[in-house]
Amino acid sequence: MRTVDLIEKKRDGGELSTEEISYLINGYVSGEIPDYQIAALAMAIYYQGMSIREIHDLTTDMVASGEQYDLSEIPGVKVDKHSTGGVGDKVTIILMPLVASFGVPVAKMSGRGLGHTGGTIDKLESIKGYQVERSKEEFIQQVKDIGISLIGQSEHLVKADKLLYALRDVTATVDSIPLIASSVMSKKIAAGADKILLDVTVGQGAFMKNMSDAEKLSETMVALGHEVNRETIAVITDMSQPLGKAIGNRLEITEAIEIMQGRGREDITDFICEMAEILLDLAQVEASQEEIRQHLVGGKALAKFEELIQAQGGDLTDLYRHTSAPVVTDIHAHETGYIKELPAMAFGKFAMQLGAGRATKSDSLNYETGIVFEKKVGDSVTQGDLIAKVYSQEILSEKMLTEFEKNVIIGRVCKKPNEILKIIS
């Protein structure tokens, strides 16, 4: 078997056999197949796609390339959740303690941010002392003890994905549905949960720009989950504007706490309750929307979040402090009407310029900077109203102020977007 022949086969639209896929993945992980050949293969897959059988085989081999977690010693139905990425996405930080407050065991590994999208682990690391690294034994024991653990991705999990992702990032093959699906699901399967909820974001602030691609990715990942007896549900959600009101690590922790204190925006509060209902249903726990909301805003989710923070070394006093960013700039409405657009991609990139995100994996973060929106799409504004506050390390330049203001689109018609667009199971 020659690698070049398999690249040619896929380039010409052929279907790779189970044995051929194993040969390629095992050879790449062992170092026998060089980067440049796998780069060529990734581009062939990008253009020619893969059958569901090929994607299943690719995912299976990726899972086998690293350590796998066995969570069977934790009683109950273990649930996991994954988002394909977005701007201002602090859902995991609120949703997982909320679900755990119902007695559902949550064993969750999360990632860091890259580019305009934020990462859950970065947000948690803005809390003084919070330890994102845990051994497998510590991770499992904590779930047994308090019902929840939220850590960073294990270095030993899905080695093939780490190699492939780094390669895709520099070869313009990131947004390939077969490669995204196998990357996401290999990590979820290896992490060991029984049931999986996928938040597939769509819109100009997401990797999936249109509904057709989001549906195809969702259907592929749900099918992969079912192939390995992991019930999987995908929820396609809107990422045309930032989620919630805050973008930035510390600012999003503050918003998460406000939501768990019953002081959050209604739209994101409702969205989290709907997502919780789906996760609880997966875990075979019956709960009404009223019960879920009471857990969220009545203190039970927050108590579980505090328990999580303490268990992982976090400082509860630091948890409740506000951002220490030295410069705060108010942005006001330049006309009267309704907020028509707040493009997520543009504001995600703006937050990156403030230091709240990374352009490359080696970039350091400023945990304190970011944006807090006082108005969102569909909200009415009068000229001069406060639309947002920008938290920065230095005074904003005129260029940055102009850039921010031009992306706040005000119209004459009130149109509020739906957060959940479609559910695929």
Model-derived features: positions:
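Well-ordered secondary-structure scaffolds
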Residues: 5, 10, 15-17, 28, ...
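Short beta-strand segments
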Residues: 109, 143, 151-153, 199-203, ...
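Self-splicing inteins and homing endonuclease
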Residues: 61-83, 136-166
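Alpha-helix C-terminal capping segments
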Residues: 47-48, 93-105, 187-192, 227-228, ...
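Glycine/serine-rich anion-binding loops at beta->alpha junctions
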Residues: 77-100, 104-116
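A glycine-rich helix N-cap at a beta->alpha junction
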Residues: 123-149, 219-225, 229
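Acidic, glycine/proline-rich low-complexity segments that act as flexible tails and inter-domain linkers
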Residues: 1-88, 127, 261, 307-311, ...
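Phosphate/diphosphate-binding glycine-rich loops and adjacent basic-rich segments that engage nucleotide
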Residues: 144-195
